[in-house]
Amino acid sequence: MAAQDKYKFVFTAKEAASEGVTEPIRLPKLIRKAMSLARGPISKYKVGAVGRASSGRVYLGVNVEFPGLPLHHSIHPEQFLVTNLALNSEKGLRQLAVAISSDCIEFGAPCGNCRQFLMETSNELDIKILLKSKHEAEGSFSSLKLLLPYRFTPDDVLPKGSPLLLEKRDNCLTLSGSTEEICSSDCSHLKCKALAAANNSFSPYTESPSGVALQDDEGKWYRGWYIESVAYSPSLGPVQAALVDFVARSRGKGFNKIVEAVLVEKNNARVSQERTAKMILDTIAAPNCDFKVFHCYVDLQKKFITE
């Protein structure tokens, strides 16, 4: 592959085929590339995942660690991959391969945290996971439902028909009653992007949607939104989701190139991201990173119309 594509995280079906991924069982052909993009400065361990979306496009997932922060703020490769699916408006994940050995020979089941995270997707029971020992030439696929028996799922909590992760949603949030006010002359524009992210946020369990927008030193912006898990602890915060976008599209930039950040979260939310977001950005972003927080409200008229 050309040198200019060494930071590529998303492949069309044709591009994937040119890399040897001509069928799902060949997903491991891209695993070394995924591992080369991982950011594991604490563990010194690079973990990669490769997944095929329902569109046929192939995505890479990597582990991301943050020196100076507690380990639970790290991003798992499977979380990275699914978040990037959401950011690219994919409708589902079909097959997934996760390397469990540094030599890229063995592939195994996602950790329990990520199996639970995968349960939030709209086609969770159809997801196939590649299992391959070092003694097998190709391995075989197993379903997520077999790898997570006696599972606790969104169906146990949410009303029937509720939109799940990777399904279209609009949280009907607004910063004020006026679009003109949102985009007035003092608007940083990141505020609008963070609001749009919050409107995509998957937070059906606490109803605390939030979104983050980041800007780097060259003016390029990135965004992500809070993704909840029915099991709570596997949830992914909005800063981490925005950092998935940053890692996937910044072409190798360090987090210290992030110079501006905006968090939009629901007013009086049961789960607030403000303090955690500030802690993360204070630790990894540029020393002078400008961090702003805006509180949004549900537009009841819009919500009534959409329902």
Swiss-Prot record:
SUPFAM superfamilies on file: Cytidine deaminase-like (SSF53927)
UniProt keyword list: Hydrolase, Metal-binding, Zinc
Top-rank taxon, per record: Eukaryota
EC number: 3.5.4.5
Residues of the CMP/dCMP-type deaminase domain: 22-155, 185-307
Cofactor(s) required, per the database record: Zn(2+)
Enzyme active site: E78 (proton donor)
Cofactor info, note text: Binds 1 zinc ion per subunit.
One of the GO biological process terms: cytidine deamination
Binding site for Zn(2+): H76, C111, C114
GO molecular function, one term: cytidine deaminase activity
Catalytic activity: cytidine + H2O + H(+) = uridine + NH4(+); 2'-deoxycytidine + H2O + H(+) = 2'-deoxyuridine + NH4(+)
PROSITE patterns per the UniProt record, alphabetical: CYT_DCMP_DEAMINASES_2
Binding site for substrate: N63, V64, E65
Protein task: This enzyme scavenges exogenous and endogenous cytidine and 2'-deoxycytidine for UMP synthesis.
Membership in a protein family: Belongs to the cytidine and deoxycytidylate deaminase family.
PANTHER family: CYTIDINE DEAMINASE
Subunit architecture: Homodimer.
Protein's recorded name: Cytidine deaminase 7
Organism whose genome encodes this protein: Arabidopsis thaliana (Mouse-ear cress)
Gene (UniProt): CDA7
